């Protein structure tokens, strides 16, 4: 009988997890269905930074017969997930929140909200700042006689890779705050390692962007600035731990 009672909480959690995952899937499907009619318009919007700087008369191409149909559909599915992120995060939060203490909830609320905003900011930065600069540079430096005709599927893969790279890298402040909050490191220790972190930012930029110094620099510089922002905000999360440690030391000295 006791084994049955002990298994009940686990079964309850699994049922709740299934229900929340089902809600996430339904949300993404509904958004996708609402957007699928506009799939070609969505692709044109994403491709606009490239088509705006292409030479007169140049167009994008499709090297496979099924590509013009499946590529916009693929993009629409990804956009549906992208739009659904706040709801998906809410479902995740609703599942794990009951296991957290009240002070942990107060600390995580702003982190969860800001991480979502930072990811969206990273994607927007890539689209409105990086794409026009990179595509303009590439089209202007093309050898004479070379016609730019980018495959629509290759462009989508390229754009999604940059969107993901910039979105993730804009989470640097959140990573720093979590590292300092959990006691893995401190603001002072990270500040002392600043030269190495700058080098690491350019190395990460080299790995996540196309093989050119221009794209690498456009990713590394925001990462360095966001690193400084993370250090600034992390100071508000760390002192409480320091104060509690000092109090514990004082109490231990008094008992001795």
UniProtKB/Swiss-Prot annotation:
Primary location class: membrane
Molecular function GO terms recorded: proton motive force dependent protein transmembrane transporter activity
Keyword annotations from UniProtKB, A to Z: Cell inner membrane, Cell membrane, Membrane, Protein transport, Translocation, Transmembrane, Transmembrane helix, Transport
Gene Ontology annotations for the cellular component aspect, listed alphabetically: TAT protein transport complex
Sequence intervals crossing the membrane: 25-45, 77-97, 117-137, 158-178, 195-215, 217-237
GO annotation (BP), single: intracellular protein transmembrane transport
Matching InterPro entries: Sec-indep_translocase_CS, TatC
Membrane topology: Multi-pass membrane protein
Localisation: Cell inner membrane
Entry-linked PROSITE patterns: TATC (PS01218)
Assembly, per entry: The Tat system comprises two distinct complexes: a TatABC complex, containing multiple copies of TatA, TatB and TatC subunits, and a separate TatA complex, containing only TatA subunits. Substrates initially bind to the TatABC complex, which probably triggers association of the separate TatA complex to form the active translocon.
Family: Belongs to the TatC family.
Function: Part of the twin-arginine translocation (Tat) system that transports large folded proteins containing a characteristic twin-arginine motif in their signal peptide across membranes. Together with TatB, TatC is part of a receptor directly interacting with Tat signal peptides.
Name recorded for this polypeptide: Sec-independent protein translocase protein TatC
Protein's organism: Haemophilus influenzae (strain ATCC 51907 / DSM 11121 / KW20 / Rd)
Name of the coding gene: tatC
């Amino acid at each position: 009988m006791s084994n049955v009672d002990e298994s009940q909480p686990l079964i309850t959690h699994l049922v709740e997890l299934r229900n929340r995952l089902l809600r996430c899937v339904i949300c993404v499907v509904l958004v996708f269905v609402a957007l699928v009619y506009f799939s070609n318009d969505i692709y044109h919007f994403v491709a606009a930074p490239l088509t705006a700087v292409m030479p007169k008369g140049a167009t994008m191409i499709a090297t496979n017969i099924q590509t013009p149909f499946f590529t916009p559909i693929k993009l629409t599915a990804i956009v549906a997930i992208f739009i659904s992120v706040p709801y998906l995060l809410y479902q995740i939060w609703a599942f794990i929140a009951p296991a957290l203490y009240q002070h942990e909830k107060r600390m995580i609320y702003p982190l969860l909200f800001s991480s979502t905003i930072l990811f969206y900011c990273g994607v927007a930065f890539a689209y409105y700042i990086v794409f026009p600069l990179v595509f303009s540079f590439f089209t202007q430096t093309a050898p004479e006689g070379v016609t730019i005709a980018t495959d629509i599927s290759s462009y989508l893969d390229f754009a999604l890779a940059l969107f993901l790279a910039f979105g993730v890298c804009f989470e640097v402040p959140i990573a720093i705050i979590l590292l300092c909050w959990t006691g893995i490191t401190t603001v002072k220790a990270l500040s002392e390692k600043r030269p190495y972190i700058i080098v690491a930012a350019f190395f990460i930029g080299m790995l996540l962007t196309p093989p050119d110094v221009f794209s690498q620099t456009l990713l590394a510089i925001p990462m360095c600035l966001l690193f400084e922002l993370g250090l600034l905000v992390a100071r508000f999360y760390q002192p409480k731990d320091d104060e509690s440690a000092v109090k514990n030391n004082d109490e231990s000295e008094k008992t001795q």
